[in-house]
Amino acid sequence: MTQASQNEKLIPVFQDEVHFRAQTTITRKWAEKGSEPKVMSKPGKNNVAYSGFVIPETGELTVTKPGWFNYESVIQSFREFIKTKPCPDGKKYCIILDNAPWHKKAIRLIWTEALAEYSDIRENIEYILLPPYSPDLNPIEQVWRITRRDKTHNRYFSSLEKLTNTLDRYFSRFFSHNKQLRNLCVFSCFLKTSSTIKKNVGGCVHVTYG
């Protein structure tokens, strides 16, 4: 286990944002040889945005709907997460996220500058920045992948509302402990001792893989 998962006071949580488009997305499918399957598609570029938090050790998934991605929506999603999924007494969440600019600004305000208005977040959350350009190290990317495979690819949605309702129902299946996302999100660089956590003087937490 990594130091993050060995530390009984820290609960690792992977975070990421995603857009799902109402416009039909096409991927491979079974079809009779020589046929030309057709799927209707809604014109336009309407989409719905989600911010997701997955706990790999249990498969629990929590999603929020930020509307758009900026540092304010990141801060709000942190607060919604700890409100929806309160941290057990004596423990803190360790949010693991990528280097998106809106993440970095939220981190600067919450932890680097340690502004008093964000003390509620610091009391419940620490963070880890993944190495740059490494989406393969964030297992919630796999959650988005299977969501598209199971619920949006090759499917026609006549309205953004119908797409949103479909996604909300699907994500709600994983709110509690479940084997599907647990098995999906457990991977070697998370479980093995090759991953270590380091803290610098400013309190910023980084992860290195060796």
Q: What would you call each of these model-derived segments?
A:
Residues 1-210:
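Short functional hotspots at interaction and active-site rims
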